[in-house]
Amino acid sequence: MSAAAGDEIKRVRVDMFTDGACSGNPGPGGWGTILRWGDTEKELWGGETPTTNNRMELMAVIRGLEALRRPVTVTIHTDSRYVHDGITGWIHGWKRNGWKTAAKKPVKNEDLWRRLDAALGTHDISWQWVRGHSGHVENERADELARRGTSEARQGKVDGQSSTIL
């Protein structure tokens, strides 16, 4: 598809709702993601054991972004201050400091932060923090998916619904 000079190619707008869960910390954990564009929704979930709640929060966003096959405009809704503050602020300093914190300590979950940074790729991203467990419908649904992922991780399953879209 080509665009006339000066015209912008319209990107599909996607809303992504994410959550992570962990039973124990560390322990079995799961992540859940809802992708919505137009009248279409896709649910993704999975889990790991052992893991932590922060790793699952990161995985929810990573797997949602990795499911997108082409550049889109995406608003990521997360109840994780760790993910929100990390990607909108802390990561810039970590990268400048060779993936060390301001206290010169290694960044926790560096592997996933690098993966998230790469997954942002060509997407036009905005971040929206939502209060968890406060009745936000999509956040509650993402939490249910994360709990499903935790349950399946206990049973030895890793991914529930995983695919590429758009």
Swiss-Prot record:
GO MF annotation list: magnesium ion binding; nucleic acid binding; RNA-DNA hybrid ribonuclease activity
Pfam families, sorted: RNase_H (PF00075)
Broad class of where this protein is predominantly found: cytoplasm
Binding site for Mg(2+) 1: D19, E57, D79
Named cofactor requirement(s): Mg(2+)
Signal peptide (residue range): none
UniProt keyword annotations, A-Z: Cytoplasm, Endonuclease, Hydrolase, Magnesium, Metal-binding, Nuclease
Keyword Hydrolase attributed: yes
Extent of Basic and acidic residues compositional bias: 145-157
Chain intervals for the UniProt region annotation (Disordered): 145-166
Top EC group: hydrolase
Chain positions recorded as Mg(2+) 2 binding sites: D19, D143
This protein's GO CC annotations: cytoplasm
NCBIfam families: PRK00203.1
Primary role: Endonuclease that specifically degrades the RNA of RNA-DNA hybrids.
Subunit structure: Monomer.
Family listed: Belongs to the RNase H family.
Protein name: Ribonuclease H
